[in-house]
């Protein structure tokens, strides 16, 4: 069989199967390099260098990912986009644990005033699937999807208690090859790696005590206490719940003494929730996926890498109630030919994103979260909206902005904006506050009768002579209005009627685009409004 092509993500010491789809492996490599980059952004030349791919290949791969909404192209820079989170969402939905247990974790965090996390095992590491953090000067910086080495965490020994000899061998090989943990970008490098035997002993102790401690193994000051959440049907560890603190608040022994009983009670409630949860109703598969990729290929030609788009589409076939799928089910869900779906499954399995399961089925692995989820899980609503605001301002040639309602409900606060270069333009700075009842965004956010009936608000010269403002609501995935999208202009440039015919359709279209991104980003993650 041929060796893995340059820029693919073949596991160390393995070669890609003959049936593997090379463009799909290369696209996955691009996404992983972007995930590891600061801010989820790299230049095209940096991607060329870090993946080892030809520049023309990088250009086609990123153009395809941009067409899918997974990245954003800004000149020579490539940035991860919120729509990419649909891949991680597929894993989290199929897993069901965040949907069933996150409320318990959030309640525990509120009660203890400490950060609480849920994590699953990922080969020789642990990966976060939920975070309930506290806002403090010293706060937890780990993100959903971050991968940590098992031996430097509290959950690690609890997962290692179920490792096979092959798992332990793989772990020792990894430690020998990377003693400083450079392959785990979420943690600082280990300056003084502990002996392997230390983790073996911690694992044996965790198996006996059914809990584990992290006493500043990741960095000085960080301590954690973990208890396993077991699957009621199998008794195996489904995930691990952890309370994380700082030595300025708790020492590691103090965590065990003061918080272990409450953590155990919360875990018992989680296990009850798993036991009594009704079977999931299978989510309907997304229709027309194969048709969409074919149409995009027709439109863009060789600049659209259809095999990459189809391969990533296979990941989205999984969902709640669709956690284990056969080849036939994947082909039916995506509209792909069986042969195409089969090659995609083989490739995704080689990339450690899929694993075989009983009954000739496949399941997603936690490694799906390595495709952009950690940096994107911290995305705020203004960050989601900003590129859409800029595009809207370019189309209508007027200043655009996003605003939210203050806690008092008496003011609006501008959280994002895009300006034009007109001699006369509305200039409102991010962070500025204005009376809600005197502004179009305020009318929308307050749901005043006329704005609620029309679905938009048009305000003339209430704040300043000559200023005309038009706003529409932005809703989250539950339908709740969370922000207002606004275009402001000088009244002399357009009549009120012209605003409704020329600006309102563009404004509504942009709000729909923001809502689509917000719906994906907010499925399993809290998206801050500011």
Language-model region placement:
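Flexible loop/coil segments at beta-strand boundaries within sensory signal-transduction domains
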Residues: 230-236, 475-481
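Conserved segment of winged-helix/HTH DNA-binding domains
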Residues: 83-110, 140, 367-395, 413-414
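Short, solvent-exposed recognition segments
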Residues: 140-218, 406, 412-465
């Amino acid at each position: 069989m041929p060796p893995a092509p340059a820029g693919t993500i073949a596991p160390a010491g393995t070669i890609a199967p003959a049936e593997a789809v090379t463009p799909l492996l290369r696209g996955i490599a691009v996404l992983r390099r972007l995930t590891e980059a600061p801010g989820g952004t790299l230049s095209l030349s940096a991607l060329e260098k870090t993946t080892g791919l030809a520049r023309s290949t990088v250009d086609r791969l990123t153009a395809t990912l941009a067409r899918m909404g997974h990245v954003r192209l800004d000149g020579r820079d490539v940035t991860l986009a919120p729509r990419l989170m649909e891949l991680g969402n597929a894993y989290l939905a199929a897993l069901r644990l965040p949907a069933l247990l996150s409320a318990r974790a959030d309640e525990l965090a509120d009660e203890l005033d400490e950060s609480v996390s849920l994590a699953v095992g990922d080969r020789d590491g642990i990966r976060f699937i939920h975070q309930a953090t506290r806002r403090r000067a010293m706060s937890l910086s780990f993100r959903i999807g971050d991968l940590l080495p098992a031996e430097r965490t509290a959950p690690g020994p609890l997962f290692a208690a179920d490792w096979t000899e092959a798992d332990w061998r793989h772990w020792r090989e990894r430690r020998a090859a990377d003693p400083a943990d450079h392959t785990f970008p979420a943690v600082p490098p280990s300056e003084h790696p502990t002996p392997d035997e230390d983790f073996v002993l911690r694992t044996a102790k965790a198996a006996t005590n059914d809990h584990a401690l992290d006493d500043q193994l990741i960095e000085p000051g960080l301590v954690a206490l973990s208890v396993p959440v077991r699957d009621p049907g199998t008794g195996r560890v489904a995930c691990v719940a952890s309370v994380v603190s700082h030595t300025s608040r708790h020492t590691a022994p103090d965590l065990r003494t003061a918080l272990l009983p409450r953590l155990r009670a919360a875990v018992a409630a989680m296990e009850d929730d798993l036991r009594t949860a009704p079977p999931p109703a299978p989510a309907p598969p997304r229709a027309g996926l194969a048709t969409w990729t074919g149409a995009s290929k027709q439109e863009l030609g060789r600049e659209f890498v259809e095999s990459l788009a189809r391969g990533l589409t296979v990941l989205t076939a999984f969902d709640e109630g669709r956690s284990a799928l056969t080849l036939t089910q994947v082909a039916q869900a995506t509209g792909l030919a069986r042969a195409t779906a089969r090659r995609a499954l083989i490739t995704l399995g080689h990339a450690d994103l899929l694993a075989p399961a009983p009954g000739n089925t496949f399941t997603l692995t936690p490694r799906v979260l390595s495709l952009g989820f950690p940096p994107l899980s911290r995305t705020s609503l203004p960050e989601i909206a900003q590129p859409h605001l800029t595009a809207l301002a370019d189309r209508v040639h007027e200043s655009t902005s996003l605003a939210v309602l203050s806690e008092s409900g008496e003011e609006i606060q501008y959280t994002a904006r895009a300006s034009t270069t007109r001699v006369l333009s509305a200039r409102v700075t991010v962070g500025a506050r204005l009376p809600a009842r005197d502004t179009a965004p305020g009318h929308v956010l307050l749901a005043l009768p006329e704005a609620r009936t029309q679905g938009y608000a048009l305000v003339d010269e209430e704040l300043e002579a000559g200023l005309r403002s038009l706003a529409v609501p932005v809703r989250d995935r539950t339908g709740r209005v969370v922000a207002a999208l606004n275009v402001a202009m000088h009244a002399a440039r357009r009549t009120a009627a012209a605003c409704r015919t020329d600006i309102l359709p563009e404004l509504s279209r942009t709000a729909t685009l923001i809502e689509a991104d917000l719906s994906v980003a907010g499925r399993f993650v809290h998206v801050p409004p500011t």
